[in-house]
């Protein structure tokens, strides 16, 4: 049986290690993707200034409706498009993807691919 606490602790350690390396590159803001049990969130953070430039979540009222849920792969694809659109309006074109220690697969890959199609470079 997998110890859930140990699994989450390892993920958090990976996330901190990667975030430390990403913060060293201050010329590009971080695109942070996070998934919860119910929703998906994404934000673009400028670490040099400590400011969130763009924020989007599947919880927003104007987010497109999905037949499955607000945490599905199709919702992640739509979230990537929304974040890319908001980033264009904010004048951000180049970012660094922060996966929060999660594997680049499934919802994260769908989100990243749609954000790239929307015009973000990473």
UniProtKB/Swiss-Prot annotation:
GO biological process entries: translation
Keywords: Ribonucleoprotein, Ribosomal protein, RNA-binding, rRNA-binding
Annotated CDD domains: Ribosomal_L18_L5e
GO terms of molecular function: 5S rRNA binding; structural constituent of ribosome
GO cellular component, one term: cytosolic large ribosomal subunit
Annotated TM spans: none
Entry's family note: Belongs to the universal ribosomal protein uL18 family.
HAMAP family: Ribosomal_uL18_B (MF_01337_B)
Quaternary structure annotation from Swiss-Prot or TrEMBL: Part of the 50S ribosomal subunit; part of the 5S rRNA/L5/L18/L25 subcomplex. Contacts the 5S and 23S rRNAs.
Entry-linked NCBIfam families: L18_bact
PANTHER family xref list: 39S RIBOSOMAL PROTEIN L18, MITOCHONDRIAL (PTHR12899), LARGE RIBOSOMAL SUBUNIT PROTEIN UL18M (PTHR12899:SF3)
Function, as annotated: This is one of the proteins that bind and probably mediate the attachment of the 5S RNA into the large ribosomal subunit, where it forms part of the central protuberance.
Protein name: Large ribosomal subunit protein uL18
Gene source species: Leptospira biflexa serovar Patoc (strain Patoc 1 / ATCC 23582 / Paris)
Gene coding for it: rplR
């Amino acid at each position: 049986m997998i110890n859930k606490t140990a699994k989450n602790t390892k993920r958090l350690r990976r996330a901190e290690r990667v975030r430390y390396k990403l913060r060293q590159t201050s010329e590009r803001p971080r695109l942070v993707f996070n998934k919860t049990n119910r929703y998906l969130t994404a934000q673009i953070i400028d670490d040099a200034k400590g400011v969130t430039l763009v924020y989007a979540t599947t919880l927003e009222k104007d987010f497109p409706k999905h037949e499955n849920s607000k945490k599905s792969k199709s919702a992640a694809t739509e979230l990537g498009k929304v974040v890319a659109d908001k980033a264009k309006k904010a004048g951000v074109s180049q970012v660094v993807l922060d996966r929060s220690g999660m594997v680049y697969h499934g919802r994260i890959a769908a989100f990243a691919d749609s954000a790239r199609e929307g015009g973000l470079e990473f």
